[in-house]
Amino acid sequence: MSDLFDYLAWRGDIPMSQAPFNPVDGLILSILSYVHFDNLVPPDLRGPISLGKAAETYLALPEGRRGRVRCPSDRKLLAALARCRRFSPLGLAFAQDRFVPEEEMQFAAIAVLLDDGSAFLSFRGTDATLVGWKEDFSMSFLDAVPAQQAALDYVERFASLFPGSLRLGGHSKGGNLAVFAGALARIKVRDRILAIYNNDGPGFTRLVLDSPGYQELLTRLHTFIPQSSVVGLLLEHDEPHTVVRSRQIGLLQHDPYSWEVEGGSFVQAEEITPGSRMADQAIKGWLAGLSPQERSQFVDSLFQLLSAGEASTTADLLQPRNLQAALRSLADDRDGTRRTLAEGLIQLARSAASVWRENVP
């Protein structure tokens, strides 16, 4: 069972001028935006730094001075890319990282300048911040969340400065941002988009799916989901998807390092698992039973509870003082948080039970 690192060992010494860009390259560059390069990559197109140089500089920094990564495998990938003739010479530029709690925005992107004269715009998925997670949940009732608008602005600004063709991509929320930005970009920009890679990213509201830009890009959208996908089936999708085999189980299949690779392609599975299909039906049934206002109230109540203490990340939630603060807030319940959450969770349980009865003899 080969993975991304096996792919780099096999194909890493062959430049893209000899072996064309493929979906596995798209996933690798999508993951790259999870690395917090901080000031190593310029915020504009003046003086791009090579991927190899950026990686070497980043990895040479003392542990306490390195920017964050999503997981240790991201650093391992960065080290492998620095040694690869296929990736090391590529330019990095136009880095943007915006975290604005008061706007409930978590957004980051980086441009990778490919050796064929095109660029790959990589959008970061959700990080560990509660702000980022709340923004994701808000996609269930907003036609556009702040990060989606930021992604569109990013693509438009980059395209105004860069004359070549474009590829867009991301993992998880990053894949959603790539599709959103491509679909709503001006037609002169859309015409330059060669492909968009959505790696297990959530879907959209009908406003986006019915837009002329989305419909126009359908043949250029490449959506990949693992067998037990949950995130990649959220909300609505009109584009076809490819089901990828993973070495993990359940929700852990969202990890792109678990996806199986063969040559320059992913190893395909025939279909998603029954568990994935049932989870999708339960969530969609639950959301269908809630008005946009009810969804908004549920999300606000949930994250008000989670942030009752000093928690700002998912890891903070497990600290005793933050758990105690959340429990006190739930017990106090002056603002009706407990009732809102209880009603929402009861409806979710009913939806899940209905799906179970329909699918399990």
Regions found by a protein language model. Name each.
Residues 1-24, 29-110, 114-119, 123-138, ...:
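Alpha/beta hydrolase fold serine-hydrolase catalytic domain that processes acyl esters and thioesters
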Residues 169-174, 178:
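Gly/Ala-rich beta-loop-alpha elbow adjacent to hydrolase catalytic centers
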Residues 178-187:
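Short glycine-enriched nucleophile-adjacent loop
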